[in-house]
């Protein structure tokens, strides 16, 4: 095995509470083989629940759709397990990818408007994508506000006198925005991949960094894609706490160049590396944004990595998700 590949088994598990025999629906992303990862030994254990594997048409993803009209009166555990051979990679020519699909705006990734102004003011150009990368890297701060007395305040996260984002907000304003969005279930907050939020407020996670980058890229007429998956820790086996995402942009004749801007912000010594390269410690589950899923009604799904669940057509979070890996 070469140094630039990694092999591991991944288990995606969802424990669903009893629905008191009301209709249960569950949607879970399914990974696919590509030029940079090989998925094998894929298995689904639905614990007796009816399921189909569906194609997401626009971006070519797959997902598991559980539709069990009788629901369940006991808890059920749905598991998908698969082996991954993942490559470290730089630019890649992917077959069957239409770059034109990745030029227009989505609900949380607008194109043009304020992004045109940013491009003009900062002389950004599609001939210098490193400039776009650096602009986002310098403008964003990695972190998640929770509350004023949270650990992030004891452990320097944002400085108390700093100004963040184009709106030059204070740390306390960042936190109150977060609390407000939580109480109103709004999406102008951390972790929704909202480019406007990223640009205005300048504090977020991987979804925010990469959405911001994609808005700027597409505004420059450089196709760019959003990739969502899981980071795989360095050890032999263990839990995976949550998702990770990254992006890539297209150069005619050269293919798609990956970027991982939030990882570069967390590890500044790797900033040069993560412009044009991504490491092997990951698995991709979905590409794109604003997914139409079978049975999910008319609304688009902005981000799809964790389970979506409905009981009698009403959104529910009566489940426990867990993810684990083991090196092969």
Regions found by a protein language model. Give the residues of each.
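Low-complexity, Gly/Ser/Thr/Pro-rich intrinsically disordered linker/tail segments
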Residues: 274-328
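Solvent-exposed loop/turn segments at secondary-structure junctions
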Residues: 32, 85-87, 142, 231-234, ...
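Acidic low-complexity segments
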Residues: 77-193, 200
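Cysteine-centered nucleophilic/redox motifs
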Residues: 26, 80, 132, 166, ...
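Extracytoplasmic/periplasmic, Sec-exported soluble proteins
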Residues: 18, 72, 121-128, 198-209, ...
